Amino acid sequence: MSDRSAVLPQYLFPKQALTNFAGWVAGKERGAVTTWIIRRFVAKYGVDMGEALESDINHYKSFNQFFTRALKPGVRPLAQADLVCPVDGAISQFGAIEGDQIFQAKGHNYSTTALVGGDAVLAARFAHGSFATLYLSPKDYHRIHMPCDGRLVRMIHVPGDLFSVNPVTARGVPGLFARNERVVCVFESAHGPFVLVLVGATIVGSMATVWHGVVNPPRGGELREWHYADQQILLKQGEEMGRFLLGSTVVMLFPPPPLAFNPDWAPTRPVRLGEAMANLANL
């Protein structure tokens, strides 16, 4: 079966209703039922609870509390690199932005303008720059951290579809990451602007940032944005900036010149928060 055929049912599936329901269930505190669900999830996906700040699953009152669990201090040391990996997950793709085109999968590109919600001026700052797309699987730690020091400038909530995100949909759904619902976070750093995009997916109940809290829901048809240039919201390298309440993917954009990525990086390779991602080629 081709990838396009494999994803065809998702065009027909009531993804929004399923996602809303999953988010509602994940937030409920159901005592022994919640504990049973968490225990089954840990066993099914091989979650390493030994790394969690609270390793006893009976501690978690809801599935969302478990899913967004904190890690023990020191289990993810920061590498000596200009940019460190912001998540636990796996590499989807990374490399140079060709003009304004980001590589998604063989035969599929999408534009930086589409990714950031249609702002061509913002997107132009990353022309011929670099990108990295990282996928978080169900077993992974689901908080997102800063790849480098940054000052928050702007946040954009872009409404969109809710296709599941995995290698099959990346190959079978054109413009997947610029098509799904997403939260675009724009930062300034000592080396220029950079963007972290939190991409939603089927059953991703919501996405949250440390400065705003839950961004979605509400889910509507209108793009929403917030400006922070007059506020001193400063986040250090490795500091938490957001989290997924179930699911998905982070896309990062950096301006030119192209980054010198970790030579060990390759598509599908597992990555850990804090490992070396890239160095700035002009330093």
From Swiss-Prot:
| Sites annotated Cleavage (non-hydrolytic) | 247-248
Q: What does this protein do?
A: Catalyzes the formation of phosphatidylethanolamine (PtdEtn) from phosphatidylserine (PtdSer).
Tell whether Lipid metabolism is among the UniProt keywords: yes
Name the domain of life this protein comes from.
Bacteria
| One GO process term, biological-process aspect | phosphatidylethanolamine biosynthetic process
User: What is the protein named?
Assistant: Phosphatidylserine decarboxylase proenzyme
Record HAMAP family: PS_decarb_PSD_B_type1
Q: Which pathway does this chain act in?
A: Phospholipid metabolism; phosphatidylethanolamine biosynthesis; phosphatidylethanolamine from CDP-diacylglycerol: step 2/2
Q: One MF term in GO for this entry?
A: phosphatidylserine decarboxylase activity
Entry keywords, A to Z: Cell membrane, Decarboxylase, Lipid biosynthesis, Lipid metabolism, Lyase, Membrane, Phospholipid biosynthesis, Phospholipid metabolism, Pyruvate, Zymogen
Active-site residue list: 88, 145, 248
**For this protein, what is the EC number?**
4.1.1.65
Where found? Answer: Cell membrane
Q: Which family does it belong to?
A: Belongs to the phosphatidylserine decarboxylase family. PSD-B subfamily. Prokaryotic type I sub-subfamily.
Tell me the cofactor note: Binds 1 pyruvoyl group covalently per subunit.
